[in-house]
Design a protein with these regions (language model features):
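Acidic, Ala/Val/Gly-enriched low-complexity intrinsically disordered segments
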Residues: 9-12
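Preference for long, amphipathic alpha-helical scaffolds in soluble/luminal domains
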Residues: 23-336
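Methionine residue identity
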Residues: 1-2
Length: 336
């Protein structure tokens, strides 16, 4: 039986050397890619199948939007487990964040109705406390969820500008400049950056990624000549902060929930790439060699409760990892 199992587990490619004796990078083989594709079609939810087709099979952006609409509520917000660790059907800022990230992913046009409905939800003030949108909401506790999505009174202190920095980045990218929500987003952006610049300690990997989204949005605004903040010092500090946040011990990447290089770096043009090039190469090799018996990637967390629901959520997250990792491997020319 052990010999049979060994045949099913993805085998690690031996490191090859070129004629100069230099170590060559590992690559994902076509047969492995096909195995991953088959797993997706057997296990992924319709939204992630639409994303898969969009990224790898010349699929239609509209199919992703249509699938995403299944998670949207009448108030313009999102729920229903779009962020797969919280099954609350009610709209919440963290679910809106998840929707915004998917729309950024497919470069959704500004005139799509889904954009305007999200802006309307954010403008409504639901779950906004005057400074930030709350990462947790009370009704989370009534539905299956990971423990970190349990509502607690110290939600603002715990989560900071996660997901607010991403939400204001979305508003600044897609909102109209003369609207109240756009003006509000600019004010929040100033306060968020001032808070970040004043901090002497590091922030979480999740809040850091939200600040990256805000930086990207501000840079897009500057290209449009809509300057309202000097982002050079913010950008410089963010680079240093990300370098500190990335876990440098590669042995922990597959067993511990931590910030790997690819959590922040998605291409060689990333502002974080040069300082982390060696670590990035290591992670790309590890992605190829560390797939599970099904040919895909395991997640590194567990709810510790709601076992049946988590088993479903786990597959949803695996599908998300498939898309993220294959996009990454393709970007770095690691798929043969």
């Amino acid at each position: 039986m052990m010999k049979i199992l060994q045949l099913l587990v993805p085998t690690e490619q031996p490191r090859q050397h070129n004629y100069k004796g230099e170590i060559q990078n590992m690559n994902l083989m076509k047969c492995d890619y096909n195995k991953i594709k088959n797993w997706m079609y057997r296990n992924a939810r319709p939204l992630d199948i639409a994303r898969w087709k969009y990224h790898f099979e010349n699929g239609n952006r509209n199919d992703v939007i249509t699938a995403l609409l299944a998670y949207q509520n009448s108030d313009g917000g999102f729920g229903h487990g779009l962020e797969a660790d919280s099954w609350n059907p009610n709209s919440s800022p963290i679910q809106a964040y998840a929707a915004c990230e998917l729309l950024f992913e497919i470069d959704c046009p500004r005139d799509e109705p889904i954009i305007q409905s999200i802006l309307g939800y954010l403008e409504s003030g639901l779950d906004f406390d005057g400074e930030v949108w709350l990462a947790e909401i009370p009704s989370n506790n009534n539905y299956p969820h990971a423990p970190w999505w349990s509502y607690e009174d110290n939600v603002k202190e715990e989560w900071g500008y996660n997901p607010t920095a991403t939400l204001i980045g979305f508003i600044l990218c897609y909102g109209k400049k003369d609207t109240s929500i756009y003006i509000k987003a600019k004010d929040i952006a100033n306060k968020a950056i001032e808070r970040y610049m004043a901090k002497t300690n590091s922030i979480s990997m999740h809040e850091s990624s939200c600040y990256i989204r805000l930086l990207n949005s501000l840079e897009s605004m500057n290209k449009d000549k809509d300057y309202f903040f000097d982002i050079s010092s913010f950008k410089s500090k963010l680079i240093k902060g990300i370098n500190y946040t990335i876990e440098q011990d590669s042995k922990k990447w597959n067993t511990t929930y931590c910030a790997t290089p690819s959590y922040f770096i998605d291409s060689s043009t990333s502002i974080f790439y040069l300082d982390n090039k060696k670590s990035m190469d290591t992670e790309l090799d590890l992605l190829i060699s560390s797939r599970n018996i099904d040919g895909v990637w395991d997640i590194t967390w567990n709810w510790g409760s709601y076992e049946k629901e988590f088993a479903i959520s786990e597959n949803w997250w695996k599908a998300n990892l498939v898309i993220k990792n294959l996009k990454l491997l393709r970007e770095f020319d690691r798929i043969l």
